[in-house]
Amino acid sequence: MEEKSKYTKTINWKQFYRNVFALVIPIAIQNLINVGVTATDVIMLGKVGEKVLSGASLAGQIQYIMTLIFYGVTSGATVLTAQYWGKKDTRTIEKVLGMGLSAGLIVAVVFAGAALGMPETLMRIYTSDPEVIAEGVKYLRIVGFSYVFMAVTQVYLNIMRSIERVMVATFIYLISLLMNIVVNAVLIFGLLGFPVMGVRGAAIGTLCARAAETVMVLVYAIFRNKVVRIRLKDMVKIDKVLLKDFAVYSMPVVLNELMWGLGT
């Protein structure tokens, strides 16, 4: 008991909680903003029509399942990153980042291919209403291109969180949300001389927002981040030992999230 009390006295609890909240609050804001990008489509399309809203919402389920897989991929990457960040082994973190980006892009390409190549088939999984399917197909044929951008952004920014660069994601997601709101309003409702585009306008707004996220990520990665760099060779030449650890941490989460997502 005496040893325990001596140990607890050495902890600066005020500093501890300050550090925790410095990480937790920005991450909570990031998640809220990220959800807002998708929610903006739903809110604005609700004013256009029920069929349009239903089509976009059901089409969004494809992205939802993909996001769950991304969560599994980034979980494995962030666990490894946190371990090596404690050792200040930034070179290994770069290898983990490259591996995570490769895995995320593979998932994104598969989902983008499905969304662009067989959107009607995907929509029929969720509904048999031809009008809803038609609106969902319009949405998927545009928003499918954004999946690749999402892969880069989500993997990179989650790695940044693990090396204590949490405010980067907050700034990027905030700009993305504002852009999505503006482009959505202009294209969905035909403001500033643009034609009324409805569900296509919402899809273009989301695509522009996701593309802007990726551009900002790449600008930061190339010009500002001197600690952990994106190296193409790390995306192609995979470290077998790291790959095994990555799979051990990622696959259970991917399978769990995927089964849960398909069940809902």
Predicted feature descriptions by range:
Residues G36-A39, K47-E50, Y84-K87, S162-I163, ...:
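Helix-loop interface residues and adjacent transmembrane-helix termini in multi-pass membrane transporters
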Residues G104, I159-V186, R200-A203, L207:
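Alpha-helical transmembrane segments of multi-pass membrane transporters/permeases
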Residues A39-I43, G113, T121, V155-I159, ...:
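Alpha-helical transmembrane segments of multipass membrane proteins
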Residues M1-P26, T81-S146, P195-S250:
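Short alpha-helical transmembrane segments in multi-pass integral membrane proteins
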Residues I65-L68, N180-N184, T214-L218:
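Hydrophobic transmembrane alpha-helices of multi-pass small-molecule transporters
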Residues L53-L116, M150-A169, T264:
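Small-residue-rich hydrophobic transmembrane alpha-helices
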Residues G46-K47, Q83, R124-I125, K138, ...:
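Transmembrane helix-loop junction
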Residues I25-V79, V107, V143-M150, K244-T264:
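Transmembrane helix-bundle signature of multi-pass secondary active exporters and lipid flippases
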